[in-house]
């Protein structure tokens, strides 16, 4: 990045396209895995209240490239389904951004910015052009489109888990007179659902 800054100050062509600032600005928007795109996909395509809330709660820190809410709240960690777009999105956005800079559509990064600089602002500051921010917006949309089908698949899996838990809970509650206590003691999805229902009832009344 220093070589680019020196070249820009001297009015010479930038020697490097791929720099740390390039990756922070155009690829890792919202943190690793382009988390801001995942947050957008959750807000737009999430079918459960929990997934939409995670998307909303992660949006503000995501603007500053902080994505721990998504990593451990969704979660992405140890989630094979979300690991695919988590790895694929940065690779594709890096390629798109490289081509855009190489073709002269967007200036190269010639000013180092901190990784926590807000999205869109860092696109302008690092390139000295609004086209840098425009490329970020384009990458954001592409990232949302990549994450969208995986979010939809996750929705179906979650809904099926909830439905299965309801059926299991219903069978157990109708089995014997003292089954309600045993339902609460189970450590599976049905037990978790039973405890959630009890908590909601206690909260409401």
What are these regions (language model features)?
Residues 2-86, 90:
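Helix-loop-helix junctions within the multi-pass membrane cores of secondary transporters/permeases
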Residues 3-20, 71-185:
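Transmembrane alpha-helical segments and their short flanking loops
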Residues 179-180, 192, 196:
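Serine residues within intrinsically disordered or low-complexity segments
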Residues 186, 190-192:
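Generic signature of intrinsically disordered, low-complexity, basic-rich segments
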Residues 190, 197-199, 205:
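Intrinsic disorder/low-complexity segments
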């Amino acid at each position: 990045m220093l070589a680019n800054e020196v070249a820009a100050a001297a009015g010479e062509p930038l020697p490097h396209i791929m720099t740390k600032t390039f990756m922070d600005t155009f690829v890792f928007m919202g943190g690793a895995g382009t988390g801001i795109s995942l947050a957008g996909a959750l807000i737009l395509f999430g079918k459960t209240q929990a997934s939409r809330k995670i998307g909303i709660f992660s949006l503000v820190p995501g603007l500053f490239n902080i994505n721990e809410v998504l990593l451990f709240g969704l979660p992405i960690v140890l989630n094979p389904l979300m690991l695919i777009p988590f790895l694929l999105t940065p690779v594709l956005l890096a390629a798109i951004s490289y081509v855009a800079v190489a073709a002269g559509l967007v200036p190269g990064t010639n000013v180092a910015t901190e990784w926590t600089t807000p999205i869109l602002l860092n696109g302008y500051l690092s390139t000295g052009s609004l086209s840098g921010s425009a490329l970020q917006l384009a990458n954001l949309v592409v990232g949302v489109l990549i994450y969208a089908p995986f979010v939809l698949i996750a929705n179906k899996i979650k809904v099926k888990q909830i439905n299965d838990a309801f059926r299991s809970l219903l069978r157990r509650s109708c089995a014997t007179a003292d089954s309600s206590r045993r339902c609460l003691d189970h450590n599976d999805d049905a037990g978790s659902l039973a405890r959630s229902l009890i908590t909601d009832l206690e909260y409401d009344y």
